[in-house]
Amino acid sequence: MRLSPDEIIFWQHGFLKLNATIVFTWGLMLVLAVGSKLITRKLSTGLKRSRWQNLLEIVVTAIEKQIEEVGLRDPKKYLGFLGTLFLFVATASLCTVIPGYEPPTGSLSTTAALAFCVFVAVPFFGIKDQGLGGYLKSYVEPTVIMLPFNIISEISRTLALAVRLFGNMMSGAMIIGILLTITPFIFPIVMTALGLLTGMVQAYIFSILAAVYIAAATRGRKPKPEPGEKH
């Protein structure tokens, strides 16, 4: 049983390798890019809309609602980044029904790259919202003594994001593989459905955690209503 798609080598020349992680990652990006282009090329504002547009609107609305529930004031500002994270991880899991496909999220290099994107996005949105001085000030609050601890916190939660997604995806694939080996004719459909569900849950958790980190950096939470204030 393979523990990682990194072990599947399609081409190698010296220290250069083309493994399944790279191939399927770029394949997923191509599918998402081409798919989004095809779906959005004929958008309509009228009553008559295509099934693909209806599906797209449902997905976008659901993602916006989740971003808003985290507390970010303007979900549209973060929709592109957070929506892409969710769709990439979710699509990587949904494609496991294709024979021969290996999800790139089963590789630590992929999950680390996704976590690094979040690591870069947090200060990007924080500086954009508060300015450089306002964002850096958050590292020395409530006192300058907290500076090293806040820096360690930023790095550790990035590592936690990468390891959490990798561990959950790999362990889920291993458990399903073991069960299918033991009972190959009884549980294949059930185990496949369970794997898809696990992947969707991990995509949701990863994107929500990214939204929470961005909300903390931007302080872009909705203000709480004062007592007696009308909603």
Swiss-Prot record:
GO terms for cellular component: plasma membrane; proton-transporting ATP synthase complex. One of its GO terms (molecular function) is proton-transporting ATP synthase activity, rotational mechanism. It holds the Pfam family ATP-synt_A. GO terms for biological process: proton motive force-driven plasma membrane ATP synthesis. Its main location: membrane. The chain crosses the membrane at residues 14-34, 78-98, 107-127, 174-194, 196-216. Keywords: ATP synthesis, Cell inner membrane, Cell membrane, CF(0), Hydrogen ion transport, Ion transport, Membrane, Transmembrane, Transmembrane helix, Transport. It is a multi-pass membrane protein. It is found in: Cell inner membrane. Belongs to the ATPase A chain family. NCBIfam families: altF1_A, ATP_synt_6_or_A, PRK05815.2-3. Key component of the proton channel; it plays a direct role in the translocation of protons across the membrane. F-type ATPases have 2 components, CF(1) - the catalytic core - and CF(0) - the membrane proton channel. CF(1) has five subunits: alpha(3), beta(3), gamma(1), delta(1), epsilon(1). CF(0) has three main subunits: a(1), b(2) and c(9-12). The alpha and beta chains form an alternating ring which encloses part of the gamma chain. CF(1) is attached to CF(0) by a central stalk formed by the gamma and epsilon chains, while a peripheral stalk is formed by the delta and b chains. This is ATP synthase subunit a. It comes from Albidiferax ferrireducens (strain ATCC BAA-621 / DSM 15236 / T118) (Rhodoferax ferrireducens). The gene is atpB.
